[in-house]
Structure formats: C-alpha cells, structure tokens
Amino acid sequence: MSRSGAIIIGLFFIASIFDVFRAEKEPPAEDSRLEDYLSSELETTAIPTVVNENSHSQDVVDSGFSKDLPKLTILYCVSCGYKQAFNQFYEFAKEKYPGLVIEGGNFSPDFWKGCLAQIVGVAKIGLIAIVITGSNPFEYIGFGYPQILQTAHYNRFSYSLLVFMIGNLFESTLSSTGAFEIFLGDKQIWSKISKERVPTQEEFLNLIDLQLKTIR
C-alpha cells in the first residue's frame, strides 16, 4: 500500500499542477454562462452605450487614434475563477479598440493573507510527506507516536487526499479577493470590490469611452 499509494498520490499532484498551468495558458474564449450572468446584472440606470445609429453596432475606433490609447489593465481574482471573465472583456475591448494594449493579472490579497497561504501550502506538503513516507517526526521531540498519526499511516491514501483537499481549501480562502479591478492608464474606472459586481459589456465599453473623452 505504501508504494502504490505514493505512486497514486504523485500522479494526482502532477495532474493537479498540470491542470493549473494549462488553465493559465488557455486563449481567450466565450463562456455562455458568464455572458448570462453579466446580462442579468445590467441595471436600468446604466451609462448610455455609444452605438452606430445606422448599423446598430458599436463603433470601432480608427486605427490612427489607437496609438494614443492608454493601457487597459484588469486585475482579477485568479482563485475565484475570473480568468474566463478577463478573456471575455479582453475580446470586448479588442473588438472596439484593435490597437488597445490590454494587460491582465492576479489581484494580490493582503500581505498577511498571502504569507499565511504560503505557510499553509508548505505545511500541506510536509504533512502529506509524513503520511506517505510513514515517518514520525514527533518521536524526535519527545511526543512519542500520536494515535492520529498511527491512523494516518495505516490509511495513507485517504489521509493524504484529505490533507490535500483541506490544505487547498484554506489556501483558496486566503488567496481569494473577489476582485475584478479595471484601470485605464493610471485611472481606475471600475472596482468589483466596492461595487460588488462585474460590469456589463455596455458599462465596460462606455466607461472606456467616457475616460478617453477626458484625455483627448
């Protein structure tokens, strides 16, 4: 059980790490469920949308003006699953402003939460190693062989998986900020933390339009 359990856990970790990196490298894509959510958030007092009256579609900014556009930055909560939301807003902005430089990244949690999340991650790996290898570090500091550790050694696979899941839960909770903060140049034009919701497509594009009018 010890050898086979170690192999299974090792494969489980490798698969988890692979999924994380693969998720980060996914190209922008549409998500119908997110689109439904954004549509449901539309307020009746939303900022008027800039629309081409003849074709009833949004105007595209002339490429000659694109070089003067400030950089659009979107900082979002990765652990909250907002990567897909960023991809969708990226497409919204690129469709209207082809020359707009857009950057996205994780909105870091408070310093102490980030440090605590790292400590939890290290502790998680250490506990899993102790369970899988069957070692007893408590013996070296005079605490003998705790009953819970004995039980974990007899059920290595299930206890390793339990530690992994609980550790991930605490790490995710500490790392989550719920943020989706949008900046145009050095000006913040939207904050999900303060407004407690993601902007609609119309609000997003109109906020960019209004901000550009102030700098032209």
Swiss-Prot record:
What SUPFAM superfamilies does this protein's entry cite? Thioredoxin-like
Q: What processes does the entry annotate via GO biological process terms?
A: cell redox homeostasis
User: What does the record note as the disruption phenotype of the gene behind this chain?
Assistant: Viable with normal development, anatomy, motility, lifespan and brood size. Double knockouts with selt-1.1 are also viable with no visible phenotype.
Q: Where is the signal peptide?
A: 1-23
User: Has keyword NADP?
Assistant: yes
Q: What is its main location?
A: cytoplasm
Which InterPro entries does the protein's record reference?
Selenoprotein_Rdx-typ, Selenoprotein_T, Thioredoxin-like_sf
Q: Which UniProt keywords apply?
A: Cell projection, Cytoplasm, Disulfide bond, NADP, Oxidoreductase, Redox-active center, Signal
Please give the positions of the paired cysteines in each disulfide bond.
C77-C80
Gene Ontology molecular function: thioredoxin-disulfide reductase (NADPH) activity
Q: Which reaction does it catalyse?
A: [thioredoxin]-dithiol + NADP(+) = [thioredoxin]-disulfide + NADPH + H(+)
EC number, UniProt record: 1.8.1.9
- Which Gene3D superfamilies does the UniProt record give? Glutaredoxin
Q: Does the keyword Aminoacyl-tRNA synthetase apply?
A: no
Any one of the GO CC terms: perikaryon
Its annotated function is as follows: Probably has thioredoxin reductase-like oxidoreductase activity.
Return the similarity comment. Answer: Belongs to the SelWTH family. SELT subfamily.
Q: What name goes with this protein?
A: Thioredoxin reductase-like selenoprotein T homolog selt-1.2
Lineage of source species: Eukaryota, Metazoa, Ecdysozoa, Nematoda, Chromadorea
The protein's gene is named: selt-1.2
